[in-house]
Amino acid sequence: MFLTRTEYDRGVNTFSPEGRLFQVEYAIEAIKLGSTAIGVKTKEGVVLAVEKRITSPLLEPSSVEKIMEIDDHIGCAMSGLIADARTLVEHARVETQNHRFSYGEPMTVESTTQALCDLALRFGEGEEESMSRPFGVSLLIAGHDENGPSLYYTDPSGTFWQCNAKAIGSGSEGADSSLQEQFNKDITLQEAETIAVSILKQVMEEKVTPNNVDIAKVAPAYHLYTPQEVEAVISRL
């Protein structure tokens, strides 16, 4: 007996006759509604810049977390459902600490990304696994390890790619084309900050301020910029 399109729509583990997983495709589309995040890799380190959508003047801007630390040498920016991102980040944090405890060394950025994507591919852990959906979030993972700086991009299918520069979220199409024009492998970390924030300024629908933009760098340690440091970057535009 053939399943209807609606039944294929609901199932996360059932391929349609065309070889598609509709729930995963819908999750990827959901990310295009999220806030824009940009990552740029340089020889010195990696810069992450993210748009923070402050939906009400009553909202405390510092409570909107769009960039999170995974380990002291890895951070990630997100676009999509923040609760889903938090689940993935918590999983990655446990993996990196277990690795450090077991082997006495930090986990590589690629291995951390792989562990995170393994969970994304299972759509959850333990009891959650049977009643789950794809994670509706995409991540830019920035890190610095024995191989130098690296930037990875993940999507809800559990796939990841290594990038020199990448944008995700609602403004990703325009931001990606701007990155292609402005990026080169010899830029400095300071130039990468300026490029990332200037492109965010182009795609955002409001004025760029320390309240609606988060910036972080991994060079080689993770550092989330203070509002004063963000203001200093904005003043260079």
From Swiss-Prot:
Functional note: The proteasome is a multicatalytic proteinase complex which is characterized by its ability to cleave peptides with Arg, Phe, Tyr, Leu, and Glu adjacent to the leaving group at neutral or slightly basic pH. The proteasome has an ATP-dependent proteolytic activity.
Listed GO MF terms: RNA nuclease activity; structural constituent of ribosome
Record has Transport as a keyword: no
InterPro entries noted in UniProt: Ntn_hydrolases_N, Proteasome_alpha, Proteasome_alpha-type, Proteasome_alpha_type_5, Proteasome_asu_N, Proteasome_sua/b
UniProt entry keywords in alphabetical sequence: Acetylation, Cytoplasm, Isopeptide bond, Nucleus, Proteasome, Ubl conjugation
PANTHER family linked: PROTEASOME SUBUNIT ALPHA/BETA
Organism: Arabidopsis thaliana (Mouse-ear cress)
Name under which the protein is recorded: Proteasome subunit alpha type-5-B
Acetylation as UniProt keyword: yes
N-acetylmethionine: modified positions: M1
Coiled-coil segments on the chain, per record: none
